[in-house]
Amino acid sequence: MTLNNGGKANERGSNENPLQALSKNEAFLVPEFLDTAQSKEKAIASKVSNTLHMSTEESEFPQQVSSTPMFSENTVHPRHEVSPKPSSKNTQLKQENISKSSGYSKQTNYSNTPKSLAKTTHPKQGSTLKPATNSTHYREDDIPKSSEDIIQPKKGDRPKSSEDIIQSKKEDRPKSSEDIIQSKKEDRPKSSEDIIQSKKEDRPKSSEDIIQSKKEDRPKSSEDIIQPKKEDRPKSSEDSVPSKKGDRPKSSEDSVQPKKEDRPKSSEDSVQSKEGEVHKPLKDSIQSKETKVPKSPQDSIQSKEDKTHRPLKDSVQSKESEEPKSSHESIQSKEDKIHKPLKDSIPSKEGDIPKSPEDTIQSQEEITASEEDTIQSQEGNTIKSSEEDVQLSESKLLGLGAEIETLEEGLVRVIKDKEEFEEVLKDAGEKLVAVDFSAAWCGPCRMMKPLFHSLSLKHEDVIFLEVDTEDCEQLVQDCEIFHLPTFQFYKNEEKVGEFSGALVGKLERSISELK
C-alpha cells in the first residue's frame, strides 16, 4: 500500500506537493481501516438507501444518490451520442486511475465504488450508457477527487481527513443524501414523471435540448465542472489539502460545498440547469408538456376533455342538443305525431319537453278518458243494446206471451166450474168440442199443453176447452176422469171420443176424424 501511495505521490508530485510531504511523514493505515469500515457501512447504507430509493424508481427513472441526479437527469436521453466519448475516457481513466490508484483501488473500491457502484449499478437498468458517461465523468470527477482529495489526505491528513471526511460524510451525506434524496424526492416526481413524460412525448425536445444542454453543459458541466475540478482540484487539492491539513471541514465544506456549490452549481446548475434545463426541457418540455403534456395529458386530457368535453360537451351538448333535438325531437316528433292527433301541435320542443310528458300524461288521461268514454259508450251501447235487445226480446216474448195469452184466451177456453162447461156444450151445437183435463203438477200435461194450443190455432172450427182438475173437482167426478192428461170430445152435448196419456198423434187423428 505504501509503495503504491508513494508511486502515486511521485506521479502527482507536480500538482500536489503538500500531499507528498504529508504522505511521507504520516502513517495512514488506521484511517484506511476507519475509512474503509465506515465507508463500507455508509456505502452499504448508501446502497441500502439507494437500493431502497432506487427500487421504487428503477422502473421509471433511476438516479444516483449523491451527484448522479445531475447526470441522470442530464444524461437521460443522449445514451447513443455521449457514450463514445466516456467510453474512451472510461478506458483511459480506468487505465490511468488503475495505474494511479492501484494501491488504493481497494480503498477506492471500498470508499468510492460503493458510491460508483451505488451510483453505477442502479442506472444500468434505466441508463446503462448513462452511468458509463456518468460513472466515467464521475470517475473523472470523483476518482480524482476520491484518489486525489481523499487518498492524498489519507497520506497527509487521514486522522483529520478521515474524521473530517467521516464527519463530512456524517454531516454531508445526510445533507447530500437527504437533500439530494429530497431533491430526488422533490425532483424525481418532477424529473421522473416529467422526464418520463418528456421521454414519452418530448424526446425530440428533451433529448435535443438536453443533448444540446449536455453538449452545452457538458462543456459547462463536464468541462466547467471538470475544469473547476481540474482548476478547483488544485484549488480543492491545494486548498482542500492544506485545508485538509487544517480545514477539512473547509475542504469537506469547500469540497462538499463545491460539491454542494459545484454540484448545486453542477447539481443545482446542472440540476437547476436540469431544473432549468430539465425544467427548461422540463419546463419547456413540462411547459411543452404543459403545453404538450397538459396538451397531451391535460390539454390533450383537457383537449380530450375539451375535445371530449368539446366533442363530449359539443357532442354531448350536441348530443344533448341533438339528442334533446334528435331524441327529444324524435320523441317530440313522436310526441308531436302522437300529440298532433291528440292535441294538434306542441310548439317549443325544449320548453315543451316537460309539457310533453304532462301533455302525454294528459293525453294519456285524455286517451284514458276517451277510452273510458268509448268503454262507457261501448258499455252504454252494449248495455243499451243489450238492454234494448233484452227489452225487445222481453217485449217480443211479452208480445208472444200476450199473443199466446190472447190465443189461449181466444182459442182455448179455461173452464172453472160445471155450469160453464154445460153452457159451452149447449152453445157449440154440432161443432166438435175438445176438452183437456190436466193439472199444473202433471208433467205430461205440461208437455201436451203447447200442442193442444197449436192445434187450436190450426183447427179454427173446433172449440178447445181446458179444465184444471184441482179447481173443478165436481166436474172431474161427473166426467169420471181417472188419468191425466185425459182428452174428451163432445158433439151436440154428447161425448163422442176419449183417450188418456200424452199421445200427440192420436190427439191429432182424433181431432181430424171427429171434426
Swiss-Prot record:
User: What tissue expression does the UniProt record report for this protein?
Assistant: Testis-specific. Strongly expressed in the testicular seminiferous tubules, mostly in the round spermatids.
Q: Which PROSITE patterns match?
A: THIOREDOXIN_2 (PS51352)
Q: Which UniProt keywords apply?
A: Cytoplasm, Developmental protein, Differentiation, Disulfide bond, Phosphoprotein, Redox-active center, Repeat, Spermatogenesis
Q: Where is this region: Disordered?
A: 1-23, 51-390
Ranges for the sequence repeats: 92-106, 107-121, 122-136, 137-151, 152-166, 167-181, 182-196, 197-211, 212-226, 227-241, 242-256, 257-271, 272-286, 287-301, 302-316, 317-331, 332-346, 347-362, 363-375, 376-390, 391-405
Q: Name one GO molecular function term.
A: protein disulfide isomerase activity
Thioredoxin domain sequence ranges? 398-515
* DNA-binding keyword on record: no
List Phosphoserine occurrences by residue: S14, S39, S146
What subcellular locations does the record give?
A: Cytoplasm
Gene Ontology process terms (BP): cell differentiation; cellular response to reactive oxygen species; flagellated sperm motility; spermatogenesis
Q: Which residue stretches belong to region 21 X 15 AA approximate tandem repeat of Q-P-K-X-G-D-I-P-K-S-[PS]-E-[KE]-X-I?
A: 92-405
Q: Name one GO cellular component term.
A: sperm flagellum
Compositional bias of type Polar residues: which residue ranges? 61-75, 85-136, 375-384
Q: What does this protein do?
A: Probably plays a regulatory role in sperm development. May participate in regulation of fibrous sheath (FS) assembly by supporting the formation of disulfide bonds during sperm tail morphogenesis. May also be required to rectify incorrect disulfide pairing and generate suitable pairs between the FS constituents. Can reduce disulfide bonds in vitro in the presence of NADP and thioredoxin reductase.
**Which protein is depicted?**
Thioredoxin domain-containing protein 2
Which species does this protein come from?
Mus musculus (Mouse)
Print the organism lineage. Answer: Eukaryota, Metazoa, Chordata, Craniata, Vertebrata
